From Swiss-Prot:
GO cellular component, one term: cytosol
Protein name: Glycine--tRNA ligase beta subunit
NCBIfam families hit by this protein: glyS
PROSITE patterns to which the protein is assigned, alphabetical: AA_TRNA_LIGASE_II_GLYAB
Length: 689
């Protein structure tokens, strides 16, 4: 039997575009895991995905599992037979499980005794017998948040299924998957090519679908076509298309046969802030905006249609007619909003709840205003501008534009603030208060914006924890994890002199008596320190490095970061492993000590050369390193401490810590405590593995 190509295609109704790629990738990963678990040798597993299909193609799939030797050890001979040599129930039960009698079992002799043994050669199952269950399992494990049923069947999937094709080479594998019997039928494009046709061999896929069905099933190829054609179309009109990856992925998932076209809109709409126009084009219509070389929006857009038309101009005109009312709405909202000052929207915030136990957006605004001013004072930002930005921070939520185009919150506040003549750093802060919105997003660009962004996020963290609604499992309705990480990123990357403890205390204080959770401050600080775990692990730091720093609970993020970098560098030193082990030993010794230690090491009680030498080093370093610790020069401090390795090793080799003489014993324990205190000024090195 030779290796063959395997094909599975699931033909469906239109799949969710934002989930299409992840569904296909998960399908491929699941089937690969199934094949590997079954011991089926195979080549590359390729995935294909289009709006109405998911498909996998496995190269060089073996025709059967390899034969394998099975060994099962049974009871020991003394437990397998009674005094009369009759098989015990334990032996008979084991034999039944193996499909033999006790008399048919072999015996295994070792240095430790003799046991019953079953050996057999199991013939591998044929691949076509195994595949249907593997496909069913792979589909059942797909990350589908909401399943649906169709017709009278109880079968559930992300969308109704119409065709299933399982081919191993040219052989159709009989199976019923998701309520559909496997067949050779493949469905083509809805309006072009052949509506359906038969496929004879797995190797024909996806080319036969491209040629006869007018469907480009290769997701990567389809995406590349759209990208190349859109770039060419933009260049033709002297522009550059905004091919942001998320929209490009979504558009790729919406079409089977991509055709790129260019359209225009009236230049008068360019008077509206570009963000509102782009929101409409990208969010509502799935169009690609076009910019000139200077980054200014052009009165053009590029879109992708799913059909080759004999009259493409008709399709272009249709899309222009669709987008025009949306742009006209944006123009109307922009003009009407500017008839009143941004600040005039402040009273209307009283009508909107932030959270039922925490009050209105107006109350939140007052807290943000106060906290932004407090933060600004700590970081050296303009306090007046920060409090002004805090006062205006949520006013744009009451504008017509943001009500209709919700994703323009913040940016419209900036435009309206500029129109009202507010200071530029105040206007920019209104736009940047929500940054960073996601991993890798830009941070606020000026100190006032940093103060406002921190204040907004900390107010939410303090309030939600203050009423006991912290995130649980995957549920995080107020995006507190993102808020915490955002605050940490701003403080660390901008090197701001803020302490999480005092920052949280101030945020909680501004709520007055509204908060019922007396532990809110500690819980928020611990939660935020916990977010460092995700951050530093993504940067490649080991878990034990993080635990070593967390053990000291440093609450100033910039200080936390300096400690992390110091410990990570320390681990690269040749002395690190020995000193980490020594710290662990010291920690264990001190944990078992029951006698109170001295405030300082008594030189007169030092008897051995090794303890005298170690005490001399520890005393000298205690004095030398204090400026290092005070200035946060933790890396330099650990480099100095690394020089203690030889003295520490010699101490443990030559000195009996638990001496019989009480005063000597306590003095030696005190010396070890002083040694450990030096390292603990940076991190708990004993936790390093």
């Amino acid at each position: 039997m030779t290796d063959k190509t395997f094909l599975v295609e699931i033909g469906t109704e239109e799949l969710p575009p934002k989930a299409l790629r992840s569904l296909a990738e998960s399908f491929a990963a699941n089937l690969t895991a199934e094949l590997d678990a079954a011991g089926l040798a195979h080549g590359e597993v390729s995935w294909f995905a289009a709006p109405r299909r998911l498909a996998l193609k496995v190269a060089n799939l073996s025709a059967a599992q390899p034969d394998r030797e099975v060994e099962k050890r049974g009871p020991a001979i003394q437990a397998a037979f009674d005094a009369n040599g009759v098989a015990t129930k334990a032996a008979e039960g084991w034999a039944r499980g193996c499909g033999i009698t006790v008399d048919q079992a072999e015996r295994l002799s070792t240095d430790k005794g003799e046991w019953l043994m079953y050996r057999a050669r199991v013939t591998g199952e044929r691949t076509q017998v195994l595949l249907p269950a593997m496909i069913a399992t792979s589909l059942a494990k797909l990350p589908i948040p909401k399943l649906m049923r169709w017709g009278a069947s109880e079968v559930q999937f992300v969308r109704p299924v119409h065709t299933v094709t399982l081919l191993l080479g040219d052989e159709l594998i009989p199976a019923n998957i998701l309520g559909i019997d496997s067949a050779r039928i493949i469905r083509g494009h809805r309006f072009m090519g052949e509506p359906e046709f038969t496929i004879d061999h797995a190797d024909q896929y996806p080319q036969i679908l491209l040629e006869r069905g007018k469907v480009q099933a290769d997701y990567a190829a389809r995406k590349a076509i759209i990208k190349a054609d859109a770039e060419a179309a933009a260049a033709k009109i002297g522009g550059v298309a905004d091919l942001s990856d998320s929209l490009l992925e979504e558009v790729t998932s919406l079409v089977e046969w991509p055709v790129v076209l260019t359209a225009t809109f009236e230049e008068k709409f360019l008077a509206v802030p570009a963000e509102a126009l782009v929101y409409t084009m990208k969010g509502d219509q799935k169009y690609f905006p076009v910019y000139d070389k200077a980054g200014k929006l052009l009165p053009n857009f590029i879109f992708v249609t799913n059909i080759e038309s004999k009259d493409p101009q008709q399709i272009i005109s249709g899309n222009e007619k669709v987008v025009r009312p949306r742009l006209a709405d944006a123009e109307f909202f922009f003009n009407s909003d500017r008839k009143r000052r941004l600040e005039d929207n402040l009273p209307r915030l009283e009508t909107v709840l932030f959270q039922k136990e925490l009050g209105t957006l107006r109350a939140k605004t007052d807290r943000i205003q106060a906290l932004a001013g407090w933060v600004a004072a700590q970081i050296g930002a303009d306090v007046n501008h920060a409090t002004r930005a805090g006062l205006l921070s949520k006013c744009d939520l009451m504008t017509n534009m943001v009500f209709e185009f919700t994703d323009t919150q913040g940016v419209m506040g900036m435009h309206y603030a500029r129109h009202d003549g507010e200071a530029e750093d105040v206007a920019v802060a209104l736009n940047e208060q929500y940054q960073p919105r996601f991993a890798g997003d830009e941070l606020p660009s000026n100190p006032v914006a940093c103060a406002l962004a921190i204040a907004d996020k900390m107010d939410t963290l303090a309030g939600i924890f203050g009423i006991g609604q912290h995130p649980k499992g995957d549920k995080d309705p107020f995006a507190l994890r993102r808020a915490a990480l955002g605050v940490l990123r701003i403080i660390v990357e901008k090197n701001l002199p803020l302490d999480l403890q005092t920052l949280t205390e101030e945020a909680v204080r501004l709520y007055g008596s509204k908060l019922s959770n007396a532990k809110a401050v500690d819980e928020v600080v611990d939660f935020m320190l916990g977010r460092f775990r995700t951050w530093y692990q993504e940067e490649g730091h080991s878990v034990d490095t993080l635990q070593a720093v967390l053990a000291r609970r440093p609450t100033r993020p910039a200080d936390f970061d300096a400690r992390m970098k110091a410990v990570s560098h320390f681990r690269t030193l040749e002395q690190a492993a020995s000193l980490a082990a020594a710290n662990k030993r010291v920690s264990n010794i001190l944990a078992k000590a029951t006698e109170p230690l001295n405030d300082s090491v008594q030189a007169s009680l030092l008897k051995e050369n090794e303890e005298i030498k170690l005490a001399t080093y520890v005393t000298a370093l205690s004095s030398k390193l204090q400026p290092f610790f005070a200035e946060g020069r933790y890396q330099d401090a650990l480099i100095e401490l690394a020089q203690l390795r030889e003295a520490v090793d010699n101490f443990f080799d030559k000195v009996m810590v638990n001496a019989e003489e009480k005063e000597v014993r306590i003095n030696r324990l005190t010396l070890l405590a002083k040694l450990r205190e030096l390292f603990l000024q940076v991190a708990d090195i004993s936790l390093l593995q």
